């Protein structure tokens, strides 16, 4: 019985390692199966977005890198679309040269080599593999730095500057034209009707110590009136145009000119000699010469010394004595006025009047009687004032006698 137990024990002991081996093999198989199953889970994954980027800001002219940021097993394939849904493709020839504007890498990077302002917008990355597809969108913003706006503003500034310059030049031309017209009008006035006649009349009045005729007075009055009228016209013309007040005080200037030539300022009086009993009350027959005007050293008594360099001129004075008719004498006594006429008008009235008591006597045609003074004609020299003063009382004794003085240069 003991032998049988020992034999069973010996038989059982060899079977234990076998069981351990069998269990070990079974455990190894299960582990292998579990490992293989885990490997299959890791290698077969759907693409996932590992990072999200909202927008990218790029300066115009620079390059831009846009990352899709998608991971998957196996590696997904990437496609890029712009904001209008157009698929971006890299041309083969550009890919071989390594150039081109759009460069797409296998890792999901989109490289825009030279960004323009028209490239702004949203870019969508589509990543796909055998397990699925995922999309990722990134917005590209471009900073506009092109020189077109600078050129635009430069053109606007040049146009504005040109307009301002044209307006200024037009205004200056209008001012210049206005001043030229004003100057031309003033010069034309004084050249035709102004200072020339007035100066001539007063030069004759200065050279002869008597008033020549009533026509000189009329000329002076007309000239003064026209001068003042032109001054008012120039003043109104200057006020009508919005220009600087260059000739606003033209009337004052004209009045000063009148004072210089002796029409406004009180000075020395020279009165024409009238017959006895006749009052020279008419103020129109009185000329005034200002005291401020001094005669020059010229022998011709000019207002300036210009005649010192000129040849001397001689003045001849012709005196005509004409008896008045009875009708004219009666009119003078009744009306109490004395009218002065020119030499030509007096001679014509004396020749054609049928009521004249006796014919007029002229120094060149008729000789006077011993009772009347002999008229004197000096063709080549100026009569001295003493001779004139000596002959005047003899002539003025007759109330019916009219004395006419005529001067010739």
Curated annotation (Swiss-Prot):
Stretches assigned to the Ig-like C2-type domain: 47-141
Keywords in alphabetical order: Cell membrane, Cytoplasm, Disulfide bond, Glycoprotein, Immunoglobulin domain, Membrane, Nucleus, Phosphoprotein, Signal, Transmembrane, Transmembrane helix
Residue positions with a glycan: 33, 37, 67, 111, 135
Disulfide cysteine pairs (residue numbers): 68-125
Residues annotated as transmembrane: 150-172
Tissues where the protein occurs: Highly expressed in testis.
SMART domains in the cross-refs: IG, IGc2
InterPro entries named in the record: Ig-like_dom, Ig-like_dom_sf, Ig-like_fold, Ig_I-set, Ig_sub, Ig_sub2
Topological category with respect to the lipid bilayer: Single-pass type I membrane protein
Protein name (record): Microfibrillar-associated protein 3-like
């Amino acid at each position: 019985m003991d032998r049988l137990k020992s034999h069973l024990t010996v038989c059982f002991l060899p079977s234990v390692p076998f069981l351990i081996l069998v269990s070990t093999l079974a455990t190894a198989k299960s582990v292998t199966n579990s490992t293989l199953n885990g490997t299959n889970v890791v290698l077969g994954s759907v693409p996932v977005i590992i990072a999200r980027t909202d927008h990218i800001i790029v300066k115009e002219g620079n390059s831009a890198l846009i990352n899709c940021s998608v991971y998957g097993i196996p590696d997904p394939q990437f496609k890029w679309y712009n904001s209008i849904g157009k698929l971006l493709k890299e041309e083969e020839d550009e890919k071989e040269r390594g150039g081109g504007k759009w460069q797409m890498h296998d890792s999901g990077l989109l490289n825009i080599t030279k960004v323009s302002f028209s490239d702004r917008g949203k870019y969508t990355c589509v990543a796909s593999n055998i397990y699925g597809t995922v999309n990722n969108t990134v917005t590209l913003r471009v900073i506009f730095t092109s020189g077109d706006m600078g050129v635009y503003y430069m053109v606007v500034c040049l146009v504005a500057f040109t307009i301002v310059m044209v307006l200024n030049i037009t205004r200056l031309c209008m001012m210049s034209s206005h001043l030229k017209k004003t100057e031309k009008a003033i010069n034309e006035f004084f050249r035709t009707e102004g200072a020339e006649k007035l100066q001539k009349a007063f030069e004759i009045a200065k050279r002869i110590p008597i008033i020549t005729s009533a026509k000189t007075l009329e000329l002076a009055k007309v000239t003064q009136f026209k001068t003042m009228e032109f001054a008012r016209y120039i003043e109104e013309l200057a006020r009508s145009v919005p220009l600087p007040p260059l000739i606003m005080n033209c009337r004052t200037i004209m009045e000063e000119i009148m004072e210089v030539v002796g029409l406004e300022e009180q000075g020395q009086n020279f009165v024409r000699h009238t017959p006895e009993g006749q009052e020279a009350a008419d103020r129109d027959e009185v000329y005034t010469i200002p005291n401020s005007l001094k005669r020059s050293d010229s022998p011709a008594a000019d207002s300036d010394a210009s005649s010192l360099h000129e040849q001397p001129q001689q003045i001849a004075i012709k005196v005509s004595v004409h008896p008045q008719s009875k009708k004219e004498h009666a009119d003078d006594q009744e009306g109490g006025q004395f009218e002065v006429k020119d030499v030509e008008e007096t001679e014509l009235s004396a020749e054609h009047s049928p009521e004249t008591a006796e014919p007029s006597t002229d120094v060149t045609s008729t000789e006077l009687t011993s009772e009347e003074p002999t008229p004197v004609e000096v063709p080549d020299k100026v009569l001295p004032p003493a001779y004139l003063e000596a002959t005047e009382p003899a002539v003025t004794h007759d109330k019916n006698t009219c004395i006419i003085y005529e001067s010739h240069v």
